[in-house]
């Protein structure tokens, strides 16, 4: 491991560098901030800090005593006798000192060095002796050979040895002896040096070695049989020993061999040898030999290693997923997701359902790759099983009429249809989407009439989505209004061509040029001014310009080249739906492709069913409907939402499965969105007092009106009063609705519907507030007034009069009487007062007496003198002012 500096070490341990330098200095190590620190210096500092903070005060030795009692049967003649045998065991656990371990390691190292030196010396000495012996043997062999040669030569040719040859031989012998002596002396010197080194090491370490030998013998006497110093390993060994003793045998460990058992004497010799026979049988591999296997763990290391980096995975997320499921997919704990979402501003629980968008944000924030999946493959298969290879044909255009309220949209359509429709709408305004188709000389046109009131924004948006052409009706005498601008925005958002019908052109105050100018400010330019939008001047009253408008619609449709599949399975969109008491759920469907036939299986949003009956916009029964034809269908399982897609499928069972799946998913997604409790909203709700709630049960005739009213009522909510729609639905008011209203103290609102007989009984018995409406204006106004009554009242103090104290008199009954002159307003006896001294309020109370001359009076007007007695206050002085006031309540309204 690379050495680190003092400054880096200080940052790692969370201390200041100066403090760490001081601690090194106290431990006897001189360091500066830039110096490097080795591992040995770190260990030295750690041991110093442990000693300084009492780290060695922990017990180093613990002795446990164990006692067991067993019964031994001893034979005595023909009878046997049971003898209780008590076995006492004593075991001492020693915590080894790291310092002692280090010293023992150093001693072992030194001893090894001494042994190595001794071995080297003995080896050198042995080598020298072996070399000397070898040389002596070689010399003897050489001499023997020379003698043999000489004798042979003498035998062959006896020659007298001269004196010179003998002298040379003697000289060679002397040189060889000198070499042998020098080699032997050198070997002796090396052996003496090695012995001297060993002697010095022995003298230096003899005391320490004696102490270590003494400690070792004591440790063996105490019976510490642990093989390892690890705390966990020791505990495992103890557990293994206890289990072994329960099974009636000793564990096999690295312990000395047991001493031979003493021979049994006396009559119990055979009986007493029973245990020995069992032990010998176990040793031979008998029945209990399996239990003699060592159970002490060899290592306490775990196989798991902590990952060095976070694992990034591909997370597949469906439409909804719970927090626990998302955590499982990301291989993390659910608490990590909860923490992350709290950082993002949302509080969730482990079982809470998240929508797909939220789960995607969380997963991407935590570094994972998200794969969005569609869980319902059945739905995909059912909708994909359509008629193929069918040629598209021309179809009639679908035209939506939009505009501001009372600009004549329905009257214009009424003239086109030659029927009075506007008179049938409550208040003369359209509150539903009306779908009609009209046959002209040049072809068929389907019209959708949308409401113009501000509350019907969603209905107008649906009309723009399902349409091919938008006719924007603008009154020539009124100009561009808010809903006119909104209709332009809907048309632009849907990418639908716009035709402007300037209505009421027959009025004297009509100003079509003003309409063109105002519309040009919103991006609608007339063809006369170089734009792309057709402007037609019409009059719904006289019929002026109607033919030109129809021709313009058909011309625009021809340019668009509208086509659709005429034959095959139908598909369309729900433009309106309602619950009819006699017919059940009724949906108005605009067929967009294919042919819808009676008996078809229709999957419509969250609902499904077989088409039992079909009716056109005039109420006539029909058997089939082609593209661009609006039709009412009966037979659905429930009331679908306006805007849902209606699709004909082949199998009713599969349609039911898809509808149930959609309902479950819709419920989960709705719950996931409702449960989002953001932190900022939590803190915003922590205010003093409670928010007043107006509970409402809302029922309407059609789905579109229900949505519009609910949205308008929710917009009335303020910080002090909140509209709480506890139940809503399409159809008449039932007994269940009345019971719920009574239990929740809610008001019941019916829009174009009535309560049945059972509901009226509950309403009368419980005195439930029931209100019927047919015009949305009146409904919203009355709810606003009801909410105004729930607002906390405001109080205001009004000063009635002011009197100046001119003199002070004493009365035996009342006390101090102030003689005053009324300078402003009127002094009333019943009103509360304040006493002012130098324009500072010093007392607030009420009058006890008000007199003019000697008579008690109720009030005294401006400019008159009077006597005033203040109740429970006698410190009235000349120059004080007495102010009379009253508190009035100010009514509040939501328009404030």
UniProtKB/Swiss-Prot annotation:
The keyword Protein biosynthesis applies. Residues 117-227, 273-282 have a biased composition (Basic and acidic residues). Residues 503-506 are annotated as: G4. Residues 428-432 are annotated as: G2. Residues 539-541 are annotated as: G5. Residues 403-410 are annotated as: G1. Residues 449-452 are annotated as: G3. GTP binds at residues 403-410, 449-453, 503-506. InterPro entries: DNA-bd_dom_put_sf, EF-G-like_DII, EFTu-like_2, IF2_assoc_dom_bac, IF2_II, IF2_N, P-loop_NTPase, Small_GTP-bd. GO terms for molecular function: GTP binding; GTPase activity; guanosine tetraphosphate binding; translation initiation factor activity. It holds the Pfam family IF2_assoc. Residues 394-563 form the tr-type G domain. Keywords: Cytoplasm, GTP-binding, Initiation factor, Nucleotide-binding, Protein biosynthesis. One of the essential components for the initiation of protein synthesis. Protects formylmethionyl-tRNA from spontaneous hydrolysis and promotes its binding to the 30S ribosomal subunits. Also involved in the hydrolysis of GTP during the formation of the 70S ribosomal complex. Belongs to the TRAFAC class translation factor GTPase superfamily. Classic translation factor GTPase family. IF-2 subfamily. This is Translation initiation factor IF-2. The gene is infB.
């Amino acid at each position: 491991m690379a050495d680190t500096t003092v400054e880096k070490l200080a940052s790692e341990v969370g201390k200041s560098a100066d403090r760490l330098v001081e601690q090194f200095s106290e431990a006897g190590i001189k360091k500066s901030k830039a110096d490097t620190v080795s591992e040995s210096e770190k260990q030295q500092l750690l041991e110093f800090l442990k000693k300084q903070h009492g780290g060695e005060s922990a017990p180093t030795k613990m002795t446990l005593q164990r006692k067991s009692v067993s019964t031994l049967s001893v034979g005595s003649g023909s009878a046997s006798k049971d003898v209780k045998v008590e076995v006492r065991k004593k075991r001492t656990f020693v915590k080894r000192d790291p310092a002692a371990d280090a010293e023992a390691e150093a001693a072992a190292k030194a001893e090894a060095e001494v042994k190595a030196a001794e071995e080297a010396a003995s080896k050198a000495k042995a080598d020298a002796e072996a070399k000397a012996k070898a040389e002596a043997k070689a010399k003897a062999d050489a001499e023997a050979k020379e003698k043999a040669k000489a004798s042979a030569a003498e035998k062959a040719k006896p020659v007298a040895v001269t004196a010179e040859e003998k002298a040379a031989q003697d000289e060679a012998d002397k040189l060889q002896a000198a070499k042998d002596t020098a080699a032997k002396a050198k070997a002796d010197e090396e052996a003496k040096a090695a012995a001297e080194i060993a002697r010095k090491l022995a003298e230096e370490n003899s005391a320490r070695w004696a102490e270590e030998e003494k400690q070792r013998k004591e440790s063996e006497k105490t019976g510490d049989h642990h093989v390892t110093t690890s705390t966990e390993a020791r505990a495992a060994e103890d557990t293994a020993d206890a289990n072994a003793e329960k099974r009636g045998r000793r564990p096999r460990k690295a312990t000395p061999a047991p001493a031979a058992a003493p021979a049994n004497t006396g009559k119990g010799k055979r009986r007493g040898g029973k245990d020995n026979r069992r032990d010998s049988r176990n040793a031979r591999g008998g029945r209990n030999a399996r239990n003699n296997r060592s159970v002490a763990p060899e290592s306490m290391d775990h196989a798991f290693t902590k990952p060095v980096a976070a694992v990034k995975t591909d997370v597949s997320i469906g439409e909804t997923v719970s927090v626990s499921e998302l955590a499982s997919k990301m291989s993390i704990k659910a608490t990590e997701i909860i923490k992350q979402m709290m950082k993002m501003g949302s509080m969730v629980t482990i079982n809470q359902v998240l929508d797909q968008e939220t789960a995607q944000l969380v997963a991407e924030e935590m570094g994972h790759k998200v794969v969005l999946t569609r869980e319902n493959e059945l739905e995909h298969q059912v909708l994909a099983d359509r008629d193929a290879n069918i040629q598209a044909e021309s179809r009639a255009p679908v035209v939506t009429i939009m505009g501001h309220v009372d600009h004549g949209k329905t009257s214009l359509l009424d003239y086109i249809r030659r029927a009075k429709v506007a008179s049938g709408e409550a208040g003369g305004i359209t509150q539903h989407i009306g779908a009609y188709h009209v046959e002209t000389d040049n072809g068929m046109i389907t019209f959708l009439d949308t409401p113009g009131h501000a509350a019907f924004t969603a209905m107008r948006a649906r009309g723009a989505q399902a349409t091919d052409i938008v006719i924007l009706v603008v009154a020539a005498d009124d100009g561009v209004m808010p809903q006119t601008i909104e209709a332009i925005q809907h048309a632009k958002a849907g990418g639908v061509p716009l035709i402007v019908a300037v209505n009421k052109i027959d009025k004297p105050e009509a100003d079509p040029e003003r309409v063109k100018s105002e519309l040009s400010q919103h991006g609608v330019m007339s063809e006369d001014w170089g734009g792309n939008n057709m402007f037609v001047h019409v009059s719904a009253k006289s019929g002026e310009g109607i033919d030109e408008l129809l021709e313009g619609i058909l011309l625009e449709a021809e340019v668009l080249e509208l086509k659709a599949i005429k034959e095959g399975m139908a598909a369309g969109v729900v433009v309106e739906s309602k619950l009819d008491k006699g017919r059940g759920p009724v949906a108005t469907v605009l067929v967009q492709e294919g042919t819808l036939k009676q008996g078809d299986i229709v999957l419509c949003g969250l609902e499904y069913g077989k088409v039992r009956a079909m009716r056109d916009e005039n109420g006539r029964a029909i058997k089939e409907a082609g593209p661009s034809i609006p039709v009412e269908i009966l037979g659905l399982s429930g009331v679908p939402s306006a805007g849902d897609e209606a699709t004909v499928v082949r199998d009713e069972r599969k349609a039911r499965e898809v509808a149930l799946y959609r309902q479950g998913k819709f419920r989960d997604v709705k719950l996931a969105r409702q449960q989002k409790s953001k932190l900022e909203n939590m803190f915003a709700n922590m205010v003093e007092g409670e928010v007043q709630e107006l509970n409402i049960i809302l029922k309407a005739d059609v789905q579109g009106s229900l949505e519009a009213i609910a949205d308008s009522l929710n917009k009335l909510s303020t910080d002090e009063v909140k509209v709480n729609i506890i139940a809503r639905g399409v159809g008449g008011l039932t007994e269940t609705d009345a019971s719920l209203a009574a239990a929740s103290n809610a008001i019941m609102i019916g829009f174009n519907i009535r309560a049945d007989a059972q509901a009226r009984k509950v309403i009368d018995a419980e005195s439930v507030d029931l209100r019927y409406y047919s015009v949305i204006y009146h409904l919203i106004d009355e709810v606003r007034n009801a909410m105004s009554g729930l607002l906390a009242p405001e109080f205001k103090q009004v000063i009635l009069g002011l009197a100046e104290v001119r003199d002070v008199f004493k009365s035996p009954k009342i006390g101090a009487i102030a003689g005053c002159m009324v300078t402003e307003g009127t002094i009333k006896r019943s009103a509360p007062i304040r006493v002012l001294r130098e324009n500072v309020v010093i007392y607030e109370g009420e009058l006890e007496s008000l007199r003019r001359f000697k008579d008690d009076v109720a009030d005294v007007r401006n400019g008159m003198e009077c006597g005033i007695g203040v109740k429970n206050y006698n410190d009235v002085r000349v120059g004080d002012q007495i102010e009379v006031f009253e508190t009035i309540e100010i009514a509040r309204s939501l328009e404030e």
